[in-house]
């Protein structure tokens, strides 16, 4: 059996396939599409409770926003998760890459504060804001 055959057809996969939380045919790099994003800590631990750590997390959000040319309209740090309203700005860089970079930065930052291993869940929750939804209501 060749490696490329594993997980296809009648050959069972060695590992279970994870279901993706993303829409199959949606362009996550589409400019000016606004996403409501929730990024959770692993095990719902309350990791966003230290003021000094949170100040640096805000710096990570700003740094990643500039690095990949995404807008971050508003964000809210809660004890065990972060909410963001964000969108690509004509960069062609998908929201998944923005969130991957942000997650990496926050995790590395947390190591300086005594955390070890993974800090955040593997993925994030997103909701595409449709034109008929009230962006102001969601932001509040």
Predicted regions and their residues:
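Short catalytic/metal-binding and nucleic-acid-binding patches
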Residues: 1-140
